[in-house]
Structures are given as C-alpha cells and as structure tokens.
Amino acid sequence: MVHDTDPSPHPISRRALLRHSAALAGSLALPAIVPASVFGARAPSNRIQVACIGTGNQGIGILRRFLGNEDVQIVAVCDVNTGSHGYKTDDQYLGREPARQEVDAHYAQLARSGSYAGCTPYIDFRDVLDRDDVDAVTIVVPDHWHAIMTVRAAERGKDIYCEKPLSLCVRDGQAMVAAVRRHQRILQTGSMQRSNPLNQFVSQTVLAGRIGTVQQVTAYIAPNNFFGPG
C-alpha cells in the first residue's frame, strides 16, 4: 500500500476511521487483544462491507471465510451463473443464487428477528463496483478477467483480494500494480502455497536436480467443472 503524502484534507472513510481508532487505542496502552464482549456486538456500520465476485467452487470457499469474520459484512454477490450442479462434484450446487441464499441464511441466524435479506445478487461486476457502500471485493473468476476487474475495482476505490494467477501476462500485471498504487488501494492475492515450507522444499529439490530430469508433470484442474477452473 502506498501512503498518502498529500497534505490537503481528504474525506475520511469508515475503513480509515477504524484504522485510526486502532492506532489511538494502541497509544493509550490498551491490551493488544481486547475481548469483543468488552465493547458488545460490533455494529454493522463498523464492519468492512465486502462484495464477492465469482461464487463457484473456489469463490464460495472464500465467501465462507469472510462469513466467519465478525469484522466483515458481505453485502453483495456476483456471478454470471444463476446456479447449477457439477462444479467439483455432481451434487455441488453453486452460483449466484446459492451464494446469496447462504449469506442471507447466515446473517439471519445472527439477527434478533431471525430474518435477513441484505445480500444483493448481481450478474454484471460493474454494477457491484458502482456501489459506494462496498469497501472491498473478492475476485475469484476465470483468469483472463483478473486484470480487468482488479483495475476497475481500484479505480472505483475498492480494496481487493484476487485469486491466483493475478494476470496472464506481464503487461496486465504491471497495469494492475499501477492502478492499485495510483488509487492507493490494498491488493492481496492467494499465493500462500509459495510460502509453504514443504512446497519450497520440493521446489528446491527439483531445481537442484536431486530427483533427476523431470519427465512428466500432471496438473489437477477440477475435471468435473463444467464452467471452468473457478
């Protein structure tokens, strides 16, 4: 993330306010971890509002991670597929409507009224990015869409989690980095396997030639997925 060096005043966002509040708490020597019960339930207005673009096999997994985070409120889902079976297994039913239903059902369990209908489904990702109340987006779609959506999201002032690979070519990757820096956004990608010590050991072993010449590599990419790797 690039820090703002412009001395002129800027309107403060909910995210910026939360960050400044956290810094202030630290300066007052509060405990590093404060139980949520001290402050009571987190108000919806204090949560980071997230929209999930892409709700297939990988996308629904990311969505569920965010559902388990009390600092986040999922307010929208987006997918061109309304809903269908057969993503990774024949009985798996995923897509835009299943994702919306899961989000609403989750928040309904937490609501005093026992009902919730605050997650809006979209077909076009541009409609999601046009929402001023969306703070961040997840982009879990076919690879050739990553650069387009990331650049557009940065331009619209959203922070971004984008699945790997970030781009299909160096030029697209450079455009993504430039857009994120220009608009001072946060971009994270899901390349955690590269940090896994076991994976690093295997890679180093192969590169060092300790297993001899590699004759064949087999890749597993959701063979039962009728709508692509996502």
Outline where the language-model segments fall:
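N-terminal glycine-/serine-/threonine-rich beta1-alpha1-beta2 phosphate-ribose binding loop
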Residues: 2-156, 171-186
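A contiguous active-site-proximal alpha/beta segment in oxidoreductase catalytic domains
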Residues: 159-161, 166-230
